[in-house]
Amino acid sequence: MQKQNSKMYPVVHFEMPAEDRVRVADFYTRVFGWETNQLGADMGNYLLVMTTESDKKGPKKPGAINGGFYQKTPDAPSCPSVVIKVDNLAQHIEKVKKAGGKILGEPMDIPNVGLFVSFADTEGNRVGLMQPYGQ
């Protein structure tokens, strides 16, 4: 087992692409009972998904995560990805680069949530980093 950091950072969110967010919302609501919240154009028409009972801090059940769907486009990743919670986004951007990853775009502010950026790991997987507000 490989372990370098004294602190482990948890997966707190998942993302999947969707061609039709209305259709995908209906599918996951009908099959799994998930609740959805369609955000506006200012948030990229992102579709938030609650997979378990949640409040403003997130899922109430320990270990559970919520997620979302983004518009599937030719230049966006076409596979699911995860978001990892960190306590210092700038520091982790540097760690990603130093370890051989590539930052995808610029960090963005998600109102009332936190700072977010995506990266590609050494295998080409798209992963998100989130520094929640209040950290």
Predicted features, each with a name:
Residues 1-26, 79-82, 86, 132-135:
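N-terminal beta-strand motif that seeds the catalytic metal site of vicinal oxygen chelate
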Residues 74-99:
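Mid-chain, well-packed structural core segment of small domains
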